[in-house]
Amino acid sequence: YTMAYFGEDLRPYWNKDGKTSIEDLYADAEEDYKEVMAKCYAFDRQLMADAYLAGGKEYAELCALAYRQSVSAFQMSEDSEGELLYFTPQVGPVDEYYPASPLYLRYNPDLVKAMLNPFFYYSESGKWGKPFPPHDLGGYPAVNGQTIGGDMPVEEAGNGLIMTAAIAKMEKNASYAEKHWKTLTQWAEYLLENGTDTGDQLTTDNFAGNCPHHTNLSAKGILGIAAYARLAEMLNKKEEAEKYMD
């Protein structure tokens, strides 16, 4: 098993059905080596070409480093309901997934969903019980709930809403948001009440301690509210769209 997930032992994704041995994996790797490596080289060339056009040689080299560092930091699994899960060893925090998300939004938005799925589950199962997302869900190898301590209500609610809206934009539909609409609405309501003046809250720079009336945090909250309004608009929820966009 790779991780304990709210009482369920998860297998690594390559052996999610429990029927694949490491010897089978080695055999498949040998058989598919040439085909897989050709795809890898083609992807590398495309990534470098896109990054070079966007910002030149140095930017492209930074993108290559960032891609490898980000992808190697995650591991993938699947729960008993077939829900894809994408974890870092700290299992969150959302404010670390947020800056990584543009990479996955471009190449595979399903992996951004897989980052958010555990947070939606934790909120919707009743295990969390707060009107904003948890900061984290535990640490490897146990995903049992927030352990780091110190909620980041505006930070994480804003991140969750913005990431969900970004998924909808990339997929050109809001079906993922619709699936979690009740939870997203709860987060948006929290931001509407607390997002413009954030009081005395932690931000992603939590080493600095609480930051009263933090301007950047307010901006995150406002963008989260706007993200919810855009999702409501995509789902033809006109009243909600007008309320949160105004």
Walk through the language-model features, giving the residues of each.
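Acidic/polar, glycine-enriched structural segments that form the non-catalytic walls/loops
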Residues: 1-92
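Aromatic-rich carbohydrate-recognition surfaces in CAZymes
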Residues: 14-37, 89-198, 214-232
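Accessory structured domains or lobes within enzymes
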Residues: 58-62, 66-68, 197-200, 216, ...
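C-terminal ends of transmembrane alpha-helices
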Residues: 72-79, 193-201
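Short linear capping/connector segments at secondary-structure termini
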Residues: 202-209
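Carbohydrate-active enzyme catalytic cores, enriched for enzymes
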Residues: 232-246
